[in-house]
Amino acid sequence: MKTVKDYIRTIPDFPEKGIMFRDVTSVIQDADGLKLAIDEMIKRLDGLDFDVIAGAESRGFVFGMPIAYALHKPFVMVRKAGKLPCETVSKTYDLEYGTATIEMHKDSVKPGQKVVLVDDLIATGGTMQAAAELVEELGGEVVKMLFLIELAGLNGRKLLSKYDVDAVVSYDGK
């Protein structure tokens, strides 16, 4: 029986020499791989009390939407700046070479709501830290951060240590 890890393609030396790129597209382009990935992520939410799934653009949408659908929960988009039409809250965070800004609609999370943040991959944790701060600014509580893949060598869990962080597959390197 195949595991999610069996569906993840590894591309050496991309985007630069010494990096082992973990390609999630090989998971979602295979019907069995996609179903297994979503099922494994849903299992990690079993018994958890939460109200909303929020996903980070763009692959957090890919995994968050089917989870929200399967569990009959609303889905909230965490988008790059300038992509949402209504009033937003925003957070700028550091990248390796510069900064990025993400936004959420001001009415997307209600005070007291329990939120699960979803993305395809955790590396340094910067995007999810910013997303969590947006949820908290809106009065929500982040009860879990859920990823398909973790690049443990980049220490994202350390940045997110105050949260419940879970990943289906973990790789030691970068």
UniProtKB/Swiss-Prot annotation:
Any GO CC annotation of this UniProt entry: cytoplasm
Pathway(s) of this molecule: Purine metabolism; AMP biosynthesis via salvage pathway; AMP from adenine: step 1/1
Name assigned to this protein: Adenine phosphoribosyltransferase
Gene: apt
Swiss-Prot/TrEMBL catalytic activity: AMP + diphosphate = 5-phospho-alpha-D-ribose 1-diphosphate + adenine
EC number: 2.4.2.7
PANTHER family named among the record's database cross-references: ADENINE PHOSPHORIBOSYLTRANSFERASE
Domain of life: Bacteria
One Gene Ontology molecular-function label: adenine binding
UniProt cross-references to InterPro entries, sorted A to Z: Ade_phspho_trans, PRibTrfase_dom, PRTase-like, UPRTase/APRTase
Keywords: Cytoplasm, Glycosyltransferase, Purine salvage, Transferase
Subunit note: Homodimer.
Purpose: Catalyzes a salvage reaction resulting in the formation of AMP, that is energically less costly than de novo synthesis.
Signal sequence extent: none
Family designation: Belongs to the purine/pyrimidine phosphoribosyltransferase family.
Cited Pfam families: Pribosyltran
GO biological process, one term: AMP salvage
EC primary class: transferase
Localization terms from the record: Cytoplasm
